[in-house]
């Protein structure tokens, strides 16, 4: 069937392939959309094109659109809705478009789980389930699962003569617990659920152990895996020998070794012609390999030492490969290998039945509770859609309803999901209506049991011309990244990806081509930053005395230094929205890593460089101090007889005991529970610690009672309130994050209580299980998407995102091979494999099946890691920076050189398949770039033609020891000071510091004037300023005055504090009558009771001085006009700078603030009164002398008050008075004169 595609409009921006993907019809379609190729836009446009075409008569509810996440589904629905509204605005009379807008909310645009839920809700009777079921979260599902599994195992243990089960327990558990069996059943259950028929898969798993009719290992279904692995290792050994021969053949090479090496190679070549029909023949051929001893070199000085060592190294590597083949595949007789499998068959059958029983019990328990979990949705939908292995009537109704089924991220589909989708699509081969979009090079979810082979099978079967099984369309044009990023990605992956190792070829159809339009730049070359961790032979012990930095720390510092340079140098970034270059911002940079283990080191390095940083970590929640403390406290409330949690709480800020006090508690009762010792210590000891313990015991008892009466969240919040722990952690470094973590604990407890489980005990047990299983929770998120910070995230978390600058870190970190070396291995094709345990002889050894599946899983893991690296490289829009540490760059580069002289573009499969980290791949590819050849000055390197721009930096770890060395020097400086010796004035930042210190700001005068000042401060300044002074001299006399805390005010008060107390009383005293001494005493007593004044302040107040004011003429006026008196009047007023400072010609203003003690506001005038507590009597010869000083001191203040009040009220200030309590003196201020 050919393609039927309308001609592309002349003015369209779509590429030919994009247009084809939008318009193609008539068959199933697979769109292989490379990174950044605009697949979402193509998918949305295809949908819109179909919906706006009124001749096609397609409604939006006749489409099934499946996305990978709920967020993607919401975005898809939003885009479609927006496009429909735009189309309707251009054609407002279209009833068809109006109908589509109305139907959009009913359209099936969702994740597959959501679609399955819709099927179950509509057709629950077909699955024989209660329609009122509740969908539970994984948290509740895991708790039900654990209970059901424990009940199942308890039942098996209780059955008499249950020999098969007990043999299984002995074979698959440790000496003390059956936790391994518990976990194995759970793993097998989860794995089986990724298959359309879990029970059938479990039964087939048993069949792989049936070897009665198998006479040779070559007849085993997984023998091709074994054969491929042996061939791979033989080829690797051959490659090593060819390298050895090359070194021996060099001028000054160890030529006497050549005869032995060529004999080795001849033997290896004979292994390439093995007949694989007979296992014993293969074994004999490999065992016959005889590596002769290489001859001794008579005159060693005639030979290049490096060539000799490299020749030996490569030959030893070849010998090791052959030895490993013998150990892994031929260490036991063929009959024993086959017998092992037959002996294990009863155990495999028993565990298969256990898993099936558990699955039934688990589902029945959920049914009893009226709940379903997410794993149930797909299988129940499948049960509804498939009856007796054929599509049910429900499935046929969906086939009629959906004119097209569109699937995004198809590469991450598993077998169950594939079966469901095929059941709701058109079953007629000539009318395929399945539209799949994805990129198998970005399939990185195998750990979630995604099956990329589904995509790859269709990719190979479908044809670009539309003939055959379906239509294949390749979208390779990248609209995200600069050419420099694409060239780097292509250069690396043309050498790495092919079907043998990566499960897909990186050919012309797969390579990335430029589609984005960026302005030219000379700054965007891909950078490879390698830090050589080899120690400098010339460095002294003193230089290394600080603790040697770990690899993560060194690399983090190198990255932080790089970022700081980019920010400081205003690295240019093209802003697509502004359509112009701008300086780089922190938010433009992301650091990607395979895992987040280096995040703490990265955060520390960023702090040193003053770089705002955020790491989105999905683990470590339970390890945070604040959460660990709260969990420990909850455990103690549940049961105080738990020594470790109790000690943690006592040592925490909640109680605040130190180590010595904890030791004294234990001495109070040396044996038994620590809680008993705590009670004993409390009763026999009189101390501050005993008081704190007594208070804690009281609180603990109250909390224990509360945990019974109230729900868990009420308990947690009560603890936060009573202990102030929430506020306390807020004051610690990272307080915002810590408080968010505590809120998250409250929220998670709330979420827990919404399940069928209740109570503190079960919650604590649930948390313990999470910790044991390693199912940690991520720390609470406190960062918004738009905050200007450098972000760090995993490569998986970055999928689908893009960033201007991407730094890929930790490239030398080893791949996580933990699953591969597990005792038990699971595989979709061959089921379950483990080592064989001979219970009678107490011997454990690997089975042939375990070895085969181990190799298969290893190859799958390598293929997935290669795809993860592809995802990482393709996140960059403009610049790509690759960073790694190497133990010894000279030795590492020599390893890379072994393949640098080959002519083929693709690297040998053995090199790619045996990689231990991303740097193994990157190093072996980048070394064939001209930049690396120039760096190493190595003529043997066969460079590959490329336009890739590469910048290589090799740095030593010493470059990043600065902090430790500077701390070390600082210690020496301290010693110099103690010894009264000069401190050396040397610094790596000397020039930079001098530049900063000598910098002169052009508007110095403006910096001497505060933008906001109090009247009191201005008064002090003017008392110091005269005709020859300038404002800068005032700084020498300015002093910050802060209120002392109240507990310090309990002692002798300062003059300022006494004045404050007097003013407070004058503000509170009634003016409706003349107060008596009794009135004032009563008022002061009331103010103390209300905590307005302290006892010390009241004692400092002279009541007779207060009464003296009301006896004065000024006081009498205040009493007479009390209804016009305003007290403590605050004001703010803008005053020209030139009016304050005679020498200033600035046109700026200063905001002055003050408080008028008292003012009498009449209709046309205002009288100001300011109270003073200055010492007068006995200090001056007479009042006249005192008055002169006081006028000079306070004139500026009162004039500022007057000008401000006049400007604010619009009334003239006619009089202004100072009243001095000491001596009852009244001083009138002349406010007519200027400043």
UniProtKB/Swiss-Prot annotation:
Gene3D superfamilies referenced in this protein's UniProt entry, alphabetically: 3.90.320.10, P-loop containing nucleotide triphosphate hydrolases (3.40.50.300)
EC number of this enzyme: 3.1.-.-, 5.6.2.4
Swiss-Prot/TrEMBL catalytic activity: Couples ATP hydrolysis with the unwinding of duplex DNA by translocating in the 3'-5' direction; ATP + H2O = ADP + phosphate + H(+)
Domain of life of the organism encoding this protein: Bacteria
GO BP annotations listed: double-strand break repair via homologous recombination
Ranges for domain UvrD-like helicase C-terminal: 509-800
PROSITE patterns found in the cross-reference section: UVRD_HELICASE_ATP_BIND (PS51198), UVRD_HELICASE_CTER (PS51217)
Residue intervals of the UvrD-like helicase ATP-binding domain: 12-482
MF terms in GO: 3'-5' DNA helicase activity; 3'-5' exonuclease activity; ATP binding; ATP hydrolysis activity; double-stranded DNA binding
This protein's GO CC annotations: cytosol; DNA helicase complex
Residues annotated for ATP binding in this entry: 33-40
Keywords: ATP-binding, DNA damage, DNA repair, DNA-binding, Exonuclease, Helicase, Hydrolase, Isomerase, Nuclease, Nucleotide-binding
Needed co-factor(s): Mg(2+)
Subunit-level organization: Heterodimer of AddA and AddB/RexB.
PANTHER family: ATP-DEPENDENT HELICASE_NUCLEASE SUBUNIT A, UVRD / RECB / PCRA DNA HELICASE FAMILY MEMBER
Similarity field: Belongs to the helicase family. AddA subfamily.
Function: The heterodimer acts as both an ATP-dependent DNA helicase and an ATP-dependent, dual-direction single-stranded exonuclease. Recognizes the chi site generating a DNA molecule suitable for the initiation of homologous recombination. The AddA nuclease domain is required for chi fragment generation; this subunit has the helicase and 3' -> 5' nuclease activities.
Name this protein carries in UniProt: ATP-dependent helicase/nuclease subunit A
Species whose genome carries this gene: Listeria welshimeri serovar 6b (strain ATCC 35897 / DSM 20650 / CCUG 15529 / CIP 8149 / NCTC 11857 / SLCC 5334 / V8)
Gene name for this UniProt entry: addA
């Amino acid at each position: 069937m050919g393609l039927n595609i309308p001609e592309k409009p002349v003015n369209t921006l779509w590429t030919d392939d994009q247009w084809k993907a939008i318009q193609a019809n008539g068959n199933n379609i697979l769109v292989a959309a490379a990174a950044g190729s605009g697949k979402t836009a193509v998918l949305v446009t295809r949908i819109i094109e179909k919906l706006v075409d009124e001749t096609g008569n397609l409604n939006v509810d006749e489409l099934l659109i499946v996305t990978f996440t709920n967020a993607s589904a919401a975005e898809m629905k939003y885009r479609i809705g927006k496009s429909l509204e735009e189309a309707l605005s251009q054609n407002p009379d279209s009833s068809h478009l109006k109908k589509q807008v109305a139907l959009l909310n009913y359209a099936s645009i969702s994740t597959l789980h959501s679609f399955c839920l819709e099927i179950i809700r509509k057709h629950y009777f077909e699955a024989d389930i209660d329609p009122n079921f509740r969908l539970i979260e994984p948290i509740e599902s895991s708790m039900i699962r654990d209970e059901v599994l424990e009940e199942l195992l308890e039942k098996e243990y209780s059955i008499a003569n249950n020999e098969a089960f007990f043999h299984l327990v002995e074979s698959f558990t440790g000496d003390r617990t059956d936790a391994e069996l518990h976990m194995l059943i759970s793993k097998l259950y989860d794995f089986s659920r990724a298959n359309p028929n879990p029970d059938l898969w479990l039964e087939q798993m048993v069949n792989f152990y049936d070897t009665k009719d198998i006479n040779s290992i070559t007849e085993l279904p997984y023998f091709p895996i074994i054969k491929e692995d042996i061939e791979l290792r033989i080829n690797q050994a051959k490659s090593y020998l060819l390298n050895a021969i090359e070194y021996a053949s060099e001028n000054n090479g160890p030529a006497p070794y050549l005869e032995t090496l060529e004999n080795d190679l001849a033997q290896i070549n004979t292994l390439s012609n093995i007949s694989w029909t007979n296992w014993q023949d293969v074994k004999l051929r490999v065992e016959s390999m005889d590596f002769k001893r290489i001859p001794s070199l008579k005159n060693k000085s005639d030979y290049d030492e490096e060539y000799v060592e490299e020749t030996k190294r490569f030959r030893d590597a070849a010998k090791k490969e052959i030895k490993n083949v013998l150990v892994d595949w031929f260490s036991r007789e063929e009959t024993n290998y086959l017998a092992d499998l037959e002996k294990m068959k009863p155990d495999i059958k028993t565990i298969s039945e256990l898993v099936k029983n558990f699955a039934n019990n688990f589902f029945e328990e959920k049914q009893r509770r009226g709940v379903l979990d997410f794993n149930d949705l797909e299988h129940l939908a499948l049960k509804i859609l498939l009856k007796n292995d054929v599509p049910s009537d429900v499935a046929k109704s969906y086939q009629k309803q959906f004119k097209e089924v569109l699937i995004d991220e198809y590469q991450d589909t598993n077998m169950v999901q594939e079966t469901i989708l095929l059941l709701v699509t058109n079953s007629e081969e000539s009318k395929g209506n399945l539209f799949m979009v994805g990129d198998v090079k970005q399939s990185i979810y195998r750990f979630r049991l995604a099956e990329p082979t589904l995509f790859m099978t269709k990719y190979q079967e479908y044809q670009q011309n539309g003939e055959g099984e379906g239509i294949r369309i390749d979208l390779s044009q990248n609209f995200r990244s600069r050419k420099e990023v694409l060239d780097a990605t292509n250069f690396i992956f043309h050498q790495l990806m092919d079907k043998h190792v990566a499960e897909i070829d990186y050919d012309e159809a797969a390579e990335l081509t430029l589609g984005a339009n960026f302005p030219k730049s000379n700054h965007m070359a891909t950078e490879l930053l390698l830090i050589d961790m080899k120690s400098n032979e010339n460095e002294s012990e003193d230089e290394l005395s600080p603790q040697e930095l770990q690899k993560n720390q060194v690399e983090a510092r190198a990255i932080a230094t790089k970022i700081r340079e980019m920010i400081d140098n205003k690295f240019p970034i093209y802003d697509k929205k502004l359509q112009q270059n701008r300086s780089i911002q922190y938010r433009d940079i992301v650091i990607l890593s395979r895992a987040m283990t280096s995040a703490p080191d990265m955060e520390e390095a960023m702090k040193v460089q003053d770089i705002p940083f955020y790491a989105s970590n999905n683990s470590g929640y339970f390890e945070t101090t604040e959460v660990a403390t709260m969990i420990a406290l909850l455990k103690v409330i549940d049961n105080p007889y738990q020594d470790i949690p109790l000690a943690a709480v006592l040592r925490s800020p909640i109680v605040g005991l130190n180590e010595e006090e904890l030791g004294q508690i234990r001495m109070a009762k040396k044996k038994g529970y620590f809680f008993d010792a705590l009670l004993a210590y409390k009763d026999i000891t009189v101390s501050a610690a005993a008081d704190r313990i007594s208070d804690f015991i009281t609180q603990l008892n109250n909390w224990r009672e509360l945990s019974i009466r109230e729900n868990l969240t009420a308990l947690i919040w009560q603890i936060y309130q009573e202990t102030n722990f929430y506020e306390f952690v807020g004051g610690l470094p990272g307080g915002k994050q810590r408080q968010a973590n505590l809120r998250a604990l409250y929220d998670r407890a709330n979420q827990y209580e919404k399940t069928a489980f209740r109570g503190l005990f079960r919650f604590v047990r649930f948390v313990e299980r999470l910790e044991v299983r390693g199912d940690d929770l991520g720390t609470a998120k406190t960062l918004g998407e738009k905050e200007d910070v450098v972000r760090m995230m995993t490569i998986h978390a970055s999928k689908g995102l893009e960033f201007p600058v991407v730094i890929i870190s930790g490239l030398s970190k080893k791949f996580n091979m933990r699953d591969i070396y597990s005792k038990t291995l699971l595989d979709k094709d061959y089921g379950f494999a483990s080592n064989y345990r001979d219970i009678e002889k107490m011997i454990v050894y690997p089975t042939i099946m375990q070895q085969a599946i181990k190799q298969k899983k290893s190859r799958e893991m390598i293929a997935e890691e290669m795809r993860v690296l592809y995802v990482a490289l393709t996140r960059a829009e403009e610049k790509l920076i690759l960073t790694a540490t190497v133990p010894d760059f000279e030795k590492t580069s020599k390893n890379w050189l072994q393949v640098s002289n080959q002519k083929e573009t693709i690297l040998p499969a053995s090199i790619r398949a045996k990689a231990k980290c991303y740097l193994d791949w990157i190093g072996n590819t980048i070394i064939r770039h001209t930049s690396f050849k120039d760096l190493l000055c190595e003529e043997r390197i066969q460079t590959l033609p490329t336009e890739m721009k590469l910048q290589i930096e090799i740095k030593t770890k010493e470059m990043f020891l600065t902090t430790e060395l500077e701390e070390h020097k600082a210690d020496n400086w301290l010693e110099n000071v103690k010894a009264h010796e000069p401190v050396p004035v040397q610094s790596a930042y000397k020039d930079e510091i001098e530049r900063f210190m000598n910098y002169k700001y052009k508007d110095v005068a403006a910096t001497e004037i505060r933008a906001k000042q109090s009247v009191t401060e201005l008064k002090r300044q003017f008392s110091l300023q005269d005709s020859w002074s300038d404002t800068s001299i005032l700084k020498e006399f300015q002093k910050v005055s802060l209120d002392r805390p109240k507990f310090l005010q309990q002692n002798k008060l300062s003059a300022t504090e006494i004045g404050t107390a007097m003013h407070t009383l004058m503000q509170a005293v009634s003016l409706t009558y003349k107060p008596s001494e009794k009135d004032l005493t009563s008022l002061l007593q009331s103010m103390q009771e209300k905590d307005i004044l302290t006892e010390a302040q009241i004692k400092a107040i002279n009541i007779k001085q207060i009464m003296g004011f009301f006896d004065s003429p000024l006081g009498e006026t205040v009493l007479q006009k009390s209804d016009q008196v305003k007290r403590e009047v605050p004001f703010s007023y803008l005053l020209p700078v030139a009016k304050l400072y005679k020498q200033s010609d600035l046109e700026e203003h200063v905001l002055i603030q003050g408080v008028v003690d008292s003012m009498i506001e009449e209709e046309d005038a205002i009288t100001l009164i300011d109270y003073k507590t200055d010492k007068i009597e006995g200090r001056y010869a007479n009042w006249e002398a005192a008055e002169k000083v006081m006028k000079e001191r306070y004139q500026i203040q009162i004039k500022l008050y007057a000008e401000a009040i006049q400007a604010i009220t619009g009334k003239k200030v006619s009089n202004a008075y100072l009243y001095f309590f000491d001596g009852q003196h009244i001083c009138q201020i002349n406010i007519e004169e200027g400043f």
